[in-house]
Amino acid sequence: VGSEMCIRDSRVAGAELDFFHKAVVFGIWAVAVVYFYWTLSSRSFVYVWDYANYLLKQYDAEAAFAQSAGAGLAYIFGSMADDYTNFITLFTEFPFCLTSHTGDAYAFCQVFCILPTLLVLLAGLVVKVGQILNVKNRTYYFLFGMTLTAAYPFLRMSAMLGQPDWFGLIFGFAILLLTMDFRFDRLEPVRVGLIFLATAAIILARRWFLYFVVGYYFAYALLLIAGCVRLAKGGEKSAALVRIKNLVLFGLASVVAMVILLWPMVSHILAYNYAGRYSYYNGGGLALEAFYHIGRMGLFNILLMVLGLAFAAKHRAPSLPCLAGCELVVSILLFTRVQNTGSHQFLLFLPGYFILFLLGTAALAEGITRRRNLKLGCWAFVLMLSMSVRCSPLTTLAIPGFVIEHFPIQIPATEYFICLLYTSDAAD
């Protein structure tokens, strides 16, 4: 049902999926099922600390709904002001209710209740970016873009550790899909309604997705204002004024409605000292966060983004790299004022990074006729490298598990989190 709703969102955004797109999505999902099953079956992992939070919440949600529907709904809505809301438990109950209720079962269930919808939205995003860039070789572009983004290690990292936070990316990708080429020339009720609902849902999924929301809408507003300035300079002042009017009207109405809808969460945020409460998790500020981002990207993805920026400069298409870059900078600066990111919080940066990834895959696809075999070989190598990255609470660098086992690397950031984990366990 969720996937069908996402396909409808893609249609509203003008990014419909054809048979080839759906076949690739299904193939990726099938590989993910095998990957999750094999990885979870071949490891030993104790679900404690943050890695048990949602499992325990799922138990509590089941117990509440077992009493009555009213008690269950009260449990869900009673967490609106909490850092961990119970919103996600509504969507992860099936097929978890059919399992042995272990931590591994909870992690594996996400392949069925979250991943299909996430992949459909990601596919729509890949198609939409290709449309904006006017990519001519759509087949190779979609194949490269869809596989390289879906295989990115830190997309699945938190899910493998029992944290279903990638659920929020469903709505993050929906926001991008619905807004990237929308310029508010007129207010489309269905589109703006979906944008509002996706924004509310991503905030409900996890509080820290607000950093993505603020960063993205700030960058998006700047992009629209820059477009209006160009229109005005070109003699189309009336069209520019219409865009500004519609943007302001939608923005004000959305903010008021969002504050009313999420008032328990908003009032808690305004009254709570997050910087003081989470200063314990601030291990090095912006410098450490920059190290995390470089390590989590990996050399090949960094090269892919550089290739994409060169492609955008060559084709004079600055809107997407500027949108993604501005969103990332604002989100990173805001987040590091409070703490540094763990693997699950890194998810809030993936929409921006994936736009940059897709710029790179567009460059690869456009030049596929030159050194085709070399490029296909590099693509296959990067996929295998991405799929072999160890999913661990202490994973700082995106490198395969067998490399870590044979060539252990001592990293100050990793040592910090080891100390943090032991200290938290001792406190408990």
Q: Predicted segments — roles?
A:
Residues 157-167:
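Short acidic/glycine- and proline-prone juxtamembrane loop motifs at membrane-interface regions
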